[in-house]
Amino acid sequence: MKIPFTPNQPFGQANPMLYGHFLEHFHRQVYGGVYDPTSPFADEDGFRTDVLEAIRDIKPAIIRWPGGCYVSAYHWHYGVGKDRPATFDKAWRVEESNEFGTDEFVKFCRKGGCEPYICTNGGTGTAEEMSDWVEYCNLKEKGIFAKERIENGYKEPHNVKFWSIGNENWGTHEIGEKDSKEWSRLVKESAKMMLRVDPPWNFPPPPSPT
């Protein structure tokens, strides 16, 4: 068999969304990694400038956050506003300060020149909690969570275009393991509520429990 090819002939353009990265609250990925207000490399928002420079250099089109296994017990509301309680991270069994939350993640992505992609809690989360997160990020002023974002200093919506539901909730290792019937109902109802809050966003299919 012969396969002819022309090495210098362009045949199409790769979608930049093929090249992305993943940021989880795991070991030093966030604290001491991308975010460290005590570092001599920290900017005015606590982001490490050396990491931001690296992000701008490799040019990922998109970054997913907050997990990973971590997201299956993560409740986003603890990570916004001035009063943020420290919580126990049931995935990695450490204390989470919640100092780096939604607003910080979106700001980090904007500074790095990439799109923020939020993965919601498909383990212990609810459809309402997920849709409230969309409201906080994307609605201009309608609703208590959009108003809360404004009170937190972000008048304009974050306009997060990429969302998904859950992580590896098919596995026994994951908090909030679900069978196929439980999973399909959660995804269906969560997506329905999220889309009713803000329809025009991208919804990558979540992994399906077997």
Regions found by a protein language model. Name each.
Residues 1-210:
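Non-catalytic accessory regions flanking glycosidase/transglycosidase catalytic cores in CAZymes
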